[in-house]
């Protein structure tokens, strides 16, 4: 995914136990490939960590639970347990009616400290000139008094369609979360429960592939 490029897609999520997840994975691997990034890992999976921002009223959480069709949220995401050795992204993700969208830009570890301390945040505007995500994030940060509220970690095994339309299937497990400022893996959601997510650019194809 290119920097500052908006990706639109349809998305369906399912809670499944480990047995069902492995059964689906066994069938999927017959006609889909593990994505290029995950193939570099021994287990065909990679670590994902996301820090989510919220206002004082937990509006993002409430809108998600209520199923609002128009919503968005900001998060910091990386794919390694060592922030100093891995790309870090500031992302905005949301929903516009039936489709979800995601847009991201690469940032540095020092920027996370700047955001967390809320000191000299405007320096990011000079560091990343004409960056839509940075501009939007800082505006929302001040307007809604956004703060990093929760961190979510998990292991992801992704499959991608090698030909034709954009189609992606991911299996997430070992899901844990904790409230900030405690930045560490904390409360395990449940060992045997995972999330299967189907994403794609064509609604008709996704309906046929849905569980």
Give names to the regions the model predicted.
Residues 1-211:
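Phosphate-end processing signature that detects enzymes handling 5′-triphosphorylated RNA
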């Amino acid at each position: 995914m290119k920097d500052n490029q908006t990706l639109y897609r349809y998305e369906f999520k399912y809670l499944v136990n480990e047995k069902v997840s492995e059964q689906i994975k066994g069938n999927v691997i017959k006609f889909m490939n593990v994505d290029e990034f995950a193939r570099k890992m021994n287990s065909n999976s990679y670590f994902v960590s996301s820090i989510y921002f919220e206002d004082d009223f937990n509006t993002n959480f409430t809108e998600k639970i209520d199923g609002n069709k128009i919503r968005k949220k900001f998060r910091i995401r990386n794919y390694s347990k060592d922030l100093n050795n891995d790309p870090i992204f500031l992302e905005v993700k949301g929903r516009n009616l039936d489709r979800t969208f995601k847009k991201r830009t690469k940032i540095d570890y020092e920027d996370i400290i700047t955001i967390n301390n809320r000191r000299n945040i405007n320096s990011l505007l000079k560091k990343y000139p004409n960056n839509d995500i940075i501009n939007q994030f800082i505006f929302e940060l001040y307007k809604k008094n956004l703060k990093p509220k929760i961190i979510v970690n998990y292991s992801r095994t992704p499959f991608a369609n090698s030909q034709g339309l954009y189609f992606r299937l991911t299996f997430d497990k070992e899901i844990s979360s904790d409230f900030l400022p405690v930045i560490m893996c904390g409360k395990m959601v449940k060992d045997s429960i995972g999330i299967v997510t189907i994403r794609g650019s064509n609604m008709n194809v996704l309906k046929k592939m849905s569980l």
